[in-house]
């Protein structure tokens, strides 16, 4: 008997680099480890992340947007199998990728990644330190220090 079309969508693709769906999902989950890609998603596709464009913070329920529900379900599906060793072995940066997928399971994180200070905190301290640390708690200060350090490095390199 042939499998139902819905059943096939629920099963992860076989972990082979020759399977197109596997390589597509591998590329997508790998890109989620990049905080700037998360920012791109938040800015360009806020409806997928349950971000209210009107800026009304009181409306935190994304149940009204079927796109946000579908994307959250897709992220949960991806996390459910990419965290297994059979699939995680193909990730270039498994720690950062799986942490990003885990964080994206949270509604509040999906809504907060539109804020530049959240992205800078992730980029400056790494996703592995999202639970605390001075830079994550005060991202404006960390960003200023980082920019100053970059400018000093550029000045120093142009003098030599």
From Swiss-Prot:
Keywords of the record: Activator, Nucleus, Transcription, Transcription regulation
GO terms under cellular component: mediator complex
Subcellular location: Nucleus
Pfam family, one: Med31
Composition bias type Polar residues, residue spans: 147-160
UniProt GO MF annotations: transcription coregulator activity
Domain of life: Eukaryota
Gene Ontology biological-process annotations: regulation of DNA-templated transcription
Region (Disordered): 124-160
Family: Belongs to the Mediator complex subunit 31 family.
Subunit structure: Component of the Mediator complex.
Known function: Component of the Mediator complex, a coactivator involved in the regulated transcription of nearly all RNA polymerase II-dependent genes. Mediator functions as a bridge to convey information from gene-specific regulatory proteins to the basal RNA polymerase II transcription machinery. Mediator is recruited to promoters by direct interactions with regulatory proteins and serves as a scaffold for the assembly of a functional preinitiation complex with RNA polymerase II and the general transcription factors.
Protein's name in the database: Mediator of RNA polymerase II transcription subunit 31
Origin species: Aspergillus terreus (strain NIH 2624 / FGSC A1156)
């Amino acid at each position: 008997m042939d499998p139902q079309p819905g059943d096939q969508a629920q099963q992860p693709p076989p972990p082979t680099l020759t399977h197109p769906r596997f390589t597509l999902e591998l590329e997508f989950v790998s890109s989620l480890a990049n905080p700037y890609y998360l920012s791109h998603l938040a800015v360009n596709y806020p409806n997928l992340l349950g971000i209210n464009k009107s800026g009304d913070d009181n409306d935190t329920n994304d149940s009204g947007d079927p796109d946000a529900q579908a994307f959250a379900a897709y992220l949960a599906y991806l996390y459910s199998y990419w965290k297994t060793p059979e699939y995680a072995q193909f990730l270039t940066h498994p720690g950062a990728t799986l942490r990003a997928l885990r964080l994206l399971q949270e509604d509040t994180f999906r809504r907060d990644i539109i804020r530049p200070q959240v992205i800078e905190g992730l980029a400056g301290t790494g996703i592995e330190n999202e639970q605390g640390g001075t830079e994550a708690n005060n991202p404006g200060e960390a960003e200023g220090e980082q920019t100053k350090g970059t400018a000093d490095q550029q000045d120093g390199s142009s003098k030599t």
